């Protein structure tokens, strides 16, 4: 708790002047990482949604030129931690494809798309999800197929195949980011936690386990809100302890799903 509302602000909002102001993890990713249900320090996290934030939780920043060149950032987290992470492409690619397909009269829902994609064999074409050609909206399927053609491969104009390409590419990108973070920070990761909307995508979670060769724990979906509330609860005396204690509450109160590597994917 950092104080109470200024009287003029409280009056404008119709709130008591005694209303407390709590400093939570004020970036949404900071609150999401606070809610990662990890019970040891040897974890990586992926906040997976429209975009992906992949990294480690550290006590000290990594300030090397190699780290900067690898596009990793050092951002403050809850309780003085450092969120050492790389910003990456995410499920924006798939949502944009769905928007294009819907405009063309293809009405496959996400569960059907993912089931069809999961039935395809591994080892198909991949793209770089971070390529700037994927930032703008509109006609994402064709841009993905063009990127595959540019790499010397072909990708059929089929929703299931394009979906599988996206998920394979994200999982491979996550694995590469985790390997780089381990090397640059001098850490070894035993488990990967996926939080946010992407934690509901079972194909993405399984392929991430396959690509990393590590156990993946998925959930909670609303990690940002959970982390925010937990820090407020601690400030109000309704919860206590450090991040490990708060995370123990998350693990005990949310249905988490674990994925183990079934086959090592190519990177």
Which residue stretches match the model-derived regions?
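Internal nucleotide-binding/catalytic subdomain
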Residues: 2-3
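Active-site core segments that coordinate phosphate-bearing ligands/cofactors
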Residues: 10-191, 200-224, 230-266
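Glycine-rich Rossmann-fold phosphate-binding loop(s) that bind the pyrophosphate
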Residues: 197
């Amino acid at each position: 708790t950092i104080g109470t509302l200024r009287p003029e602000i409280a009056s404008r909002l119709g709130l008591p002047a005694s209303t407390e102001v709590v400093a939570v993890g004020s970036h949404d990713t900071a609150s999401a990482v606070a809610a990662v249900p990890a019970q040891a320090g040897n974890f990586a996290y992926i906040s997976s949604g429209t975009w992906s934030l992949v990294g480690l939780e550290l006590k000290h920043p990594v300030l090397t030129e190699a780290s900067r060149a690898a596009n990793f950032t050092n951002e403050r987290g809850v309780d003085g931690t450092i969120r050492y992470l790389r910003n990456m492409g995410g499920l924006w690619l798939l949502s944009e494809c769905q928007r294009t397909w819907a405009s063309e009269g293809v009405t496959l829902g996400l569960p059907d798309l993912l089931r069809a994609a999961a039935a395809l064999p591994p080892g198909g074409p991949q793209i770089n999800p971070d390529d700037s050609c994927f930032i703008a909206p509109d006609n994402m399927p064709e841009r993905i197929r063009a990127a595959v053609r540019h790499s010397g491969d072909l990708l059929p104009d089929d929703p299931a195949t394009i979906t599988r390409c996206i998920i394979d590419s994200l999982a491979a990108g996550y694995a590469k980011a985790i390997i780089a973070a381990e090397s640059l920070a001098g850490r070894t990761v035993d488990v990967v936690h996926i939080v946010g909307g992407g934690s509901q995508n079972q194909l993405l979670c399984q392929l991430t386990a396959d690509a990393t060769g590590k156990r993946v724990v998925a959930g909670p979906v609303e990690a940002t809100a959970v982390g925010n509330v937990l820090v407020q609860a601690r400030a109000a005396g309704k919860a206590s302890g450090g991040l490990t204690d708060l995370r123990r509450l998350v693990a005990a109160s949310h249905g988490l799903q674990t994925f183990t590597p079934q086959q090592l994917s190519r990177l």
